[in-house]
Amino acid sequence: MAKWNPQKRVLNHEHTRFWRFELRDVDEPNLQKEVFPYDEVSRIDFDHRIIPIQPAEEIFITDTTFRDGQQARPPYTTQQIVDLYQMMSRLGGYNGIIRQTEFFLYSNRDKEAVRMCQDLGLQYPEITGWIRAAREDIPLVKEAGLKETGILTSVSDYHIFLKLNMTRSQALEEYLGIVKAILDAGIVPRCHFEDITRADIYGFCIPFAIELMKLREESGVDIKIRLCDTMGYGVTYPGASLPRGVDKLVRAFIDDADVPGRLLEWHGHNDFHKALINATTAWLYGCSAANSTLLGLGERTGNPPIEGLIIEYIGLMGKTNGIDTTVITDIANYFKNEIEYKIPSNYPFVGADFNVTRAGVHADGLIKSEEIYNIFNTTKILKRPIVPMITDKSGKAGIAYWINSHFGLSGDSTVDKRHPGISKINKWIADEYELGRVTTISTEELEAKVRKYMPELFMSDLERIKFKAAEAAIAVLRKIIDDPAMKTMQPELQEPVMQRFIEEYPSIQFAYVVDMNGKKTTRNITNIVDRAKYENYGVGTDQSDREWFIKPLQTGKLHVTDFYISKMTGALCFTVSEPITDDNDDMVGIFGVDIRVEDLVKEPEYIAEATQIALKAEYDAKYKSDHWL
């Protein structure tokens, strides 16, 4: 019988048994070659049915940075995941506009990242899982203590027939079985309708969704459905037909499968430059959740960018609802500085040049009023003031301002216009225009000149590698230092701790402890292959003249040496050392480790550069010694 629609306040027609959406179990896959000819660009066809917008009652954002986002790049470290998760929470705000995020659950690193994010106790985004449609994966979700997980339920015949080697009925039976098993485990299932924009919508997807809604009614659990535009085929044109029309896809699930819009989620890809507009269109036609990643990073061409959805959300709603847009810039800076990801300079909202204009007529407009050529108050909304264009009229003050703005220098780090490097850059610019130049100086040109004339502002690639290696060593070193056994200064207790350290981190060539007089107190803790090389370097060896001993003794702080060539192994190394303190915080000794550069740096040019530095330092030291300097 007809059902009451509380939103539209009328009775919805219910089809008789002669006109119901039931599974069409075909013998051959329907690959819809008339729309998706593999040797040609796919077609965009129209049925000329225009659907009015019917926005979801509530719209929000979900995230897949730590799942889909990691399929496009080297995996994030555990700490990077924790840091990004915290920033994501700040960005989405107290109302949870960024409502959920999903994690892989397979590796120890994945599990550790989930645990560390859970320990933060943040309400949003809620942490959910992602598993295959396999019963053996369900315990992973339970072990992680998660309330919800996504499951891969591919819906196109490309996947069902060609990838899974199943029929539609077999796939449906398999999917419903895993959903029931997840429900039995007390977990909320989120079915990922993979490759939906190439699927038979009324021959498989809607019948599948109807069965899921039956399970929802029986179990009382809100089973969710993610509409996955896996290949980015979705289009937003009025009158575009299924399966590519985003509006018709969303309404089919709501109107014909009786799926509440709050349980629908759009997951898109950017293969045809439509990831963002497809996601926001799904919002406008009743889908509550739009799935995304930070900076749009995802498999192949990526996903809708969170920062883009954030700005679009505010534009559609007319208010922020607790969103902190300035965090967008914090996230971008983290990607650039910590993850060392190069963001394209013209990337919206976060690229180096997104609010920079170079055309002379535009520059004139900006001088008269910032609003003429700036999209909004980028200083207030994104902490990104307009960066001035540099010409021969900028002068030293303008160049200094550009450098400080572009590189985010503040306080004591700022560059003054009297810096000698500024004068050299200013002269180069003047010479350019003297020779007939009429365009503004590009960001790339200025960066190159700043690197040339003000190198102290930059770490070299080699220094950055050393810094990262030392940073990793320091984190482990401090764990060792804090071990109660180390504080005792009793070698028989310290040595087992140090040996475990060496075995866990093979780049550590040698670990040792010296007392306050610089005398070595521990036996040779090294890899077995190097043990014989340290035969004459036993307990009692005097190290009091070594930099790694003197500096921590003087400052009470951790110290990292320059590169050197080990006299024991001939390997290129650097040393990290730190004071050992007792329970009264009194210094009782120094703990040091020698780290092999070759194990950390694979690029031969960097090893060669570091070797030259080490050899020069060795020569200089010998020269001073020979000349009593």
Curated annotation (Swiss-Prot):
Limits of the Cache domain: 497-601
Cofactor dependence: Co(2+); Mn(2+)
Enzyme type, top EC level: transferase
InterPro entries, per the entry: Aldolase_TIM, PYR_CT, Sensor-like_sf
The UniProt record lists the keyword Lipoprotein: no
EC number: 2.3.3.3
Quaternary organization: Homotetramer.
Domain Pyruvate carboxyltransferase: 59-329
Inducing factors: Expressed under all growth conditions.
Provenance organism: Syntrophus aciditrophicus (strain SB)
Protein name: Citrate (Re)-synthase
